[in-house]
């Protein structure tokens, strides 16, 4: 068919039995789109199309349209908090506990005792504060929002003192200096890239100073000839000068981390004297995406009054899942925090898992010891021991074959590898099945 007169009309083509049972309005929309493309190709390229071919083009677009854009993948990169693969995983038990609230009406902003309007942050705020030892807390949609809200609330139009070595950029071109400017603050840099002492901050304080800010360099490190001021030292200086001190912790963790990961890493339990601290919920904490701000009660109260909070607030889904995750910490149910569970797996456990998988494969794979990273922009210079299954043959071809099966691995030393550090327990049998199916072809 290369004659425009032979192109079927939309109302006729959608009556084809191939579209029986499908959404008529969507089929109609896609039919118009495909027929326009067919006309253009006939005119511009002298292309030829058969009716059956046009029907198949419409069907292909229909099923693509209905396929979920977000799809389940198996993370075999070894990176536990993989930003591109949605960071921390929520345990099914956490989801189960939160489900009654998520799937029904709730007292999100209703006080059951008084029968009047309530505040969505009261419960989760007190829960976080109790868990981590702070006076109060508030939650926004991510840590970038937390940084912006804190700066805008307490330092708009005034000076913010920060170390030159902490003016970082994280993923998505999020740059601290630009965020400060957009929040209405005046940036005052102190120290040098590799050294910033307490007296550098002290000498920079003026009548226009509102805050002393520390930013954790979570996604890079300065080694060698370097020196920095701790958050607690900055807090003491701020207290003497009647200023607010704020620590953008970034990843943030509480408790213990394996493989010496917590060495020189600021722990929430050691920051209780800092006026305000913010961190991500879906990184080392292992909960949902959000930004958590903890600190002095009177300062959190001022944050709640900022009109920006309505634009940055979280919904009942985030609050419910976060609350259940925090309760797991309080109850020492660390096995329900998937990120912590994966990071704490020993090399021996991973080797046992590799052997178990190999016994179920038609063709056993090479088991290799390797190293990986935490991910999520945290601890970039700290490697974690791990165990992987390595494939022979063309590494790029193997990577493509498994990616098409929604199994994401990595290439190392010219071999395609499936790193078991990030493999979820529920995905083991699925992985075995996919390996066997893929290796048969």
Swiss-Prot record:
<dbReference type="GO" id="GO:0001514">
    <property type="term" value="P:selenocysteine incorporation"/>
</dbReference>
<comment type="function">
    <text>Converts seryl-tRNA(Sec) to selenocysteinyl-tRNA(Sec) required for selenoprotein biosynthesis.</text>
</comment>
<dbReference type="InterPro" id="IPR015421">
    <property type="entry name" value="PyrdxlP-dep_Trfase_major"/>
</dbReference>
<keyword id="KW-0648">Protein biosynthesis</keyword>
<dbReference type="GO" id="GO:0004125">
    <property type="term" value="F:L-seryl-tRNA(Sec) selenium transferase activity"/>
</dbReference>
<protein>
    <recommendedName>
        <fullName>L-seryl-tRNA(Sec) selenium transferase</fullName>
        <ecNumber>2.9.1.1</ecNumber>
    </recommendedName>
</protein>
<comment type="pathway">
    <text>Aminoacyl-tRNA biosynthesis; selenocysteinyl-tRNA(Sec) biosynthesis; selenocysteinyl-tRNA(Sec) from L-seryl-tRNA(Sec) (bacterial route): step 1/1.</text>
</comment>
<keyword id="KW-0663">Pyridoxal phosphate</keyword>
<dbReference type="GO" id="GO:0005737">
    <property type="term" value="C:cytoplasm"/>
</dbReference>
<dbReference type="InterPro" id="IPR018319">
    <property type="entry name" value="SelA-like"/>
</dbReference>
<comment type="similarity">
    <text>Belongs to the SelA family.</text>
</comment>
<dbReference type="InterPro" id="IPR004534">
    <property type="entry name" value="SelA_trans"/>
</dbReference>
<dbReference type="GO" id="GO:0001717">
    <property type="term" value="P:conversion of seryl-tRNAsec to selenocys-tRNAsec"/>
</dbReference>
<dbReference type="Pfam" id="PF03841">
    <property type="entry name" value="SelA"/>
</dbReference>
<feature type="modified residue" description="N6-(pyridoxal phosphate)lysine">
    <location>
        <position position="283"/>
    </location>
</feature>
<keyword id="KW-0808">Transferase</keyword>
<dbReference type="InterPro" id="IPR015424">
    <property type="entry name" value="PyrdxlP-dep_Trfase"/>
</dbReference>
<keyword id="KW-0963">Cytoplasm</keyword>
<keyword id="KW-0711">Selenium</keyword>
């Amino acid at each position: 068919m290369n004659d425009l007169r032979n192109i079927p009309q939309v109302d006729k083509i959608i009556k084809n039995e191939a579209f029986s049972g499908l959404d008529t309005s969507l089929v109609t929309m896609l039919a118009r789109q495909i027929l326009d493309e067919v006309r253009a190709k006939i005119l511009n390229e002298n292309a030829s199309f058969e009716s059956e071919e046009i029907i198949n083009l419409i069907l292909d677009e229909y099923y693509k349209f209905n396929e979920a854009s977000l799809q389940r993948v198996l993370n075999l990169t070894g990176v536990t908090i993989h930003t591109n693969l949605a960071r921390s995983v929520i345990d099914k038990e956490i989801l189960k506990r939160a489900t009654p609230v998520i799937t029904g009406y709730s007292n999100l902003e209703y006080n059951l005792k008084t029968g009047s309007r309530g505040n969505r942050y009261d419960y989760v705020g007190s829960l976080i504060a109790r868990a981590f030892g702070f006076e109060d807390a508030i939650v926004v949609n991510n840590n970038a929002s937390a940084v912006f809200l804190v700066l805008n609330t307490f330092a708009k139009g005034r000076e913010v003192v920060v170390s030159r070595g902490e003016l970082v950029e994280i993923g998505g071109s999020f740059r601290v200096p630009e965020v400060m400017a957009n929040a209405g603050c005046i940036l005052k840099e102190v120290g040098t890239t590799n050294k910033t002492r307490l007296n550098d901050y002290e000498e920079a304080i003026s009548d226009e100073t509102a805050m002393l800010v520390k930013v954790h360099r979570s996604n890079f490190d300065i080694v060698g000839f370097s020196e920095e001021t701790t958050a607690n030292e900055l807090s003491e200086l701020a207290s003497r000068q009647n200023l607010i001190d704020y620590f953008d912790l970034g990843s943030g963790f509480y408790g213990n981390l394996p493989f010496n990961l917590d060495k020189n890493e600021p722990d929430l339990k050691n920051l209780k004297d800092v006026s305000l601290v913010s961190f991500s919920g879906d990184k080392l904490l292992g909960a949902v995406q959000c930004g958590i701000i903890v600190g002095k009660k009177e300062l959190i109260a001022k944050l709640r009054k900022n009109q920006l909070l309505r634009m940055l607030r979280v919904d009942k889904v985030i609050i419910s899942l976060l609350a259940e995750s925090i309760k797991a910490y309080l109850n020492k149910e660390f096995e329900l925090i998937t990120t912590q569970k994966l990071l704490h797996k020993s090399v021996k456990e991973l080797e046992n898992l590799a052997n178990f998988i190999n016994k179920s494969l038609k063709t056993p794979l090479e088991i290799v010891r390797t190293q990986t990273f935490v991910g999520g922009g945290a601890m970039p210079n700290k490697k974690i021991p791990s165990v992987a299954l390595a494939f022979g043959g063309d590494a790029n071809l193997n990577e493509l074959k498994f990616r098409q099966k929604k199994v994401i691995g990595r290439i190392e030393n010219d071999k395609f590898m499936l790193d078991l550090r990030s493999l979820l327990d529920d995905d083991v049998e699925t992985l075995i099945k996919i390996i066997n199916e893929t290796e048969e072809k």
